[in-house]
């Protein structure tokens, strides 16, 4: 489903390239490293393409992003503030300008799947930009976000 959708949307894009499907063991590894269970739609996307080298991150890039955030950004915040503003998110796509598309993690540890959010790195704030993964992909490659 996602592979066909993205393939159609990027056919005139010289930079985006669908990748091979992500092995299940790598998705499991990423979930463990991030510390949160990925929503079903994110897992489904990764099972079809492990990123697109443009907008969608691979599981390796997801892990590297979390590692970078924990090693660099954590020192600038109190622990609770870091958890709330940075670490309580699942970042899986980028706009190329330092901001990330993500799911928020609620204080009870559950993933907020009511929307997909844009995390703004200058303000450490999020706002909803899409209803679901399909909506996000269509909006991004359609130039709406």
PLM region descriptions:
Residues 32, 67, 105, 114, ...:
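A ubiquitous, low-specificity "background" feature that marks scattered single residues
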Residues 1-101, 144:
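A surface-exposed partner-binding patch
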Residues 102-130:
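Segments surrounding the PLD/"HKD" phosphodiesterase catalytic module and close analogs
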Residues 125-135, 139-142:
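Compact, glycine/acidic-enriched structural inserts
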Residues 96-97, 110, 138-145:
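A broadly tuned preference for mixed-charge, low-complexity surface segments
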């Amino acid at each position: 489903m996602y592979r066909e959708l993205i393939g159609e949307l990027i056919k005139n894009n010289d930079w985006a390239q669908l990748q091979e499907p992500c092995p299940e063991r790598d998705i499991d590894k990423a979930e463990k490293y991030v510390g949160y269970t990925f929503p079903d739609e994110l897992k489904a996307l990764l099972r079809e393409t492990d990123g697109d080298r443009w907008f969608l991150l691979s599981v390796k890039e997801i892990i590297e992003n979390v590692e970078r955030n924990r090693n660099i950004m954590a020192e600038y915040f109190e622990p609770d503030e870091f958890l709330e503003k940075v670490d309580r998110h699942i970042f899986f796509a980028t706009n190329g300008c330092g901001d990330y598309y993500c799911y928020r993690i609620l204080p009870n540890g559950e993933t907020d799947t009511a929307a997909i959010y844009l995390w703004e790195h200058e303000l450490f704030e999020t706002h909803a930009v899409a209803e679901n993964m399909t909506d996000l992909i269509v909006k991004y490659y359609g130039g709406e976000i």
